[in-house]
Curated annotation (Swiss-Prot):
Source organism of the structure: Stutzerimonas stutzeri (strain A1501) (Pseudomonas stutzeri)
Function as written in the Swiss-Prot or TrEMBL entry: Specifically methylates the uridine in position 2552 of 23S rRNA at the 2'-O position of the ribose in the fully assembled 50S ribosomal subunit.
Keywords, in A-Z order: Cytoplasm, Methyltransferase, rRNA processing, S-adenosyl-L-methionine, Transferase
SUPFAM superfamilies tied to this protein: S-adenosyl-L-methionine-dependent methyltransferases
Compartments where found: Cytoplasm
Catalytic reactions of this protein: uridine(2552) in 23S rRNA + S-adenosyl-L-methionine = 2'-O-methyluridine(2552) in 23S rRNA + S-adenosyl-L-homocysteine + H(+)
Protein name: Ribosomal RNA large subunit methyltransferase E
Gene: rlmE
GO cellular component terms attached to this protein's record: cytoplasm
Enzyme class: transferase
Length: 206
């Protein structure tokens, strides 16, 4: 089957991507790990002993970074509809976190605790239809904000990937209504032509 120009371009970029090569060398699960590493260096998000939740975690790039920082006295609770291999200091729930049974499983694992930080690098399966992809992306990030409002510790922090486009400004306002401070970051590991940015929201109002 002949590949489309866009898929060929992605493959060429991926093969030659310095962050892909670096991830392989450093033993990290994905190039996206470096996005969280950079965000953490700038915004001091993760500390040893913390409880972190990772929404849309597979293949585990962010959970791997967070688990390494929180250490044995901390914990990362990760969830995704896709399977994810085991990682140190990480508990994983497979399923759709908006479904009652999966949400209850997450609550059971929290056991009354509230996360200090919720992170999400979640993205929909891309269809190639820009308007549909943007709508799907905004729907997913709104679901992560719903989870934040249900379980995040007051004063806690939230990091989420957003694709700039229809609905993103309204989502930013919505996040700002629930947090003391929100900044927009574009990590070095984000591909230059990507519309993705990361909202770093601090001081959940509860």
């Amino acid at each position: 089957m002949k590949r489309s120009k866009s898929s060929r371009r992605w493959l060429d970029e991926h093969v030659n991507d310095p962050f892909v090569k670096r991830a392989q060398k450093d033993g990290l699960r994905s190039r996206s790990s470096y996005k969280l590493i950079e965000l953490n260096e700038k915004d001091k998000l993760i500390r040893p002993g913390m409880l972190v939740m990772d929404l849309g975690s597979a293949p585990g790039g962010w959970s791997q970074v967070a688990g390494g920082i929180v250490g044995e006295k901390g914990r990362v609770l990760a969830t995704d509809i896709l399977p994810m291999g085991g990682l140190d200091n990480v508990d994983f729930v497979q399923g759709d976190f908006t479904e009652d049974a999966v949400f209850q499983q997450i609550l059971d694992m929290l056991d009354g605790r509230q996360p200090d930080l919720i992170v999400s690098d979640i993205a929909p399966n891309i269809s190639g239809v820009a308007a549909a992809d943007q709508a799907a992306s905004m729907y997913l990030v709104e679901l992560t904000l719903d989870m934040v409002r249900q379980v995040l510790k007051p004063g806690g922090n939230y990091v989420v990937k957003v694709f700039q486009g229809e609905g993103s400004d309204e989502f930013l306002k919505d996040v700002r209504s629930s947090f003391e401070k929100v900044v927009i970051r574009k990590p070095e590991a984000s591909r230059p032509r990507s519309r993705e940015v990361y909202l770093v929201a601090k001081g959940f109002k509860g």
